[in-house]
């Protein structure tokens, strides 16, 4: 079965993103296809390259990045929500005249069209 996940909670502070990550791992372990994860609202904080959890905590941001690298899962973040919360890639940083970018490698700024496409092409869309 083909799945897409929508994450609306930040990497730290709530259980949403952590539960979504564990669900993603379980899907793959059970042989399902996870085509994409769409980060929306506060979920865009999962793509912030500048997070630095304590050394004894799981690094969820890098966990998502590894999911992308190892399994080819698309990690799309809503561009409008990201810009409002200070998450920018190099292109947007240049366009906005910002000194640097902070989008974690493996993540892509996307519009809501990416979520709509996932909704149409996947068997299930699960929101956390």
Swiss-Prot record:
Species classification: Bacteria, Pseudomonadati, Pseudomonadota, Gammaproteobacteria, Enterobacterales
Name of this protein: Sulfurtransferase TusD
Keyword Transmembrane helix among UniProt keywords: no
PANTHER family: PROTEIN YCHN, SULFURTRANSFERASE TUSD
Pfam families attached to this UniProt entry: DsrE
Residues of the active site: 78 (cysteine persulfide intermediate)
Function (record text): Part of a sulfur-relay system required for 2-thiolation of 5-methylaminomethyl-2-thiouridine (mnm(5)s(2)U) at tRNA wobble positions. Accepts sulfur from TusA and transfers it in turn to TusE.
Organism annotation: Escherichia coli (strain 55989 / EAEC)
EC supergroup of this enzyme: transferase
GO BP terms in the entry: tRNA wobble position uridine thiolation
Alphabetical UniProt keywords: Cytoplasm, Transferase, tRNA processing
């Amino acid at each position: 079965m083909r799945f897409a996940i929508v994450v609306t909670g930040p990497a730290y502070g709530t259980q949403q993103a952590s539960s979504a990550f564990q669900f993603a791992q379980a899907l793959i372990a059970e042989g399902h296809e996870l085509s994409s994860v769409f980060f929306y609202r506060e979920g865009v904080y999962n793509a912030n390259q500048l997070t630095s959890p304590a050394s004894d905590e799981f690094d969820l941001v890098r966990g998502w990045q590894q999911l992308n690298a190892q399994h080819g899962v698309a990690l799309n973040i809503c561009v409008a929500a990201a810009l409002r919360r200070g998450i920018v890639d190099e292109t947007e940083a240049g366009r906005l005249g910002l000194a640097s970018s902070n989008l974690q490698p493996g993540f892509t700024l996307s519009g809501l069209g990416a979520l709509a496409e996932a909704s149409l092409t996947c068997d299930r869309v699960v929101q956390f």
